[in-house]
Amino acid sequence: MNRSKGSSSRRTFLRLAALLLPAGALLGSLQGVRAAARPRKLYLAGPDVFRADAVAHGEALKALCARYGFEGLYPLDNALPKQLAEPREQAAWIYRANIGLIERADAVLANLNFFRGAEPDSGTAFEVGYATALGKPVYGYVDDAGSYAERIRRHAPELIGEDPTRDRDGMTLEEFGLPLNLMLAVPATLVVGDAEQALRQLASRRHG
């Protein structure tokens, strides 16, 4: 008797569920959540925009993204309006355009190699922070392994003081075994290698 009542209750529940939730809707929504969690559009951050071949390099990066199933969004995709002649206006327009690309992207792929010193490009660092604040995944790549302090000693020995744990101004070299300052290294997934190696890892997680 109890088994019969239980079976009847289950049938009633299933009929109600069928009325309230169209067939396949739950599966579709779950697949949508999974798809949203797998980045498709990547903002390509880095000091590469300062290269002599910046446009060609950006096209190569976007082609590389496409090879791994992503759409690359490169800062120089934005064409500066010709009517903006004043440098400050141009700078403000570029800032807003880059912010717009980050907001459109599902994730950020960042070149975090040292640039003009023993730190990544400051603009790229800001973009990483902005993307992190938006809850977007960040994948960064650096050419060489080692801790932040080790990499500074290797790339910029002229900055090191008599005490190898401090720079020439007496400031402590950060040493947590991370390749960059912790405020970049903790939120980002860092890959030792180039953009393709970072994309390969990102793609493997996407399809995993």
Q: At which residue positions do the language-model features occur?
A:
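N-terminal secretory signal peptides that target proteins for export/translocation
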Residues: M1-R3
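Conserved catalytic or regulatory cores that recognize and/or transform ribose-phosphate-containing ligands
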Residues: S7-G208
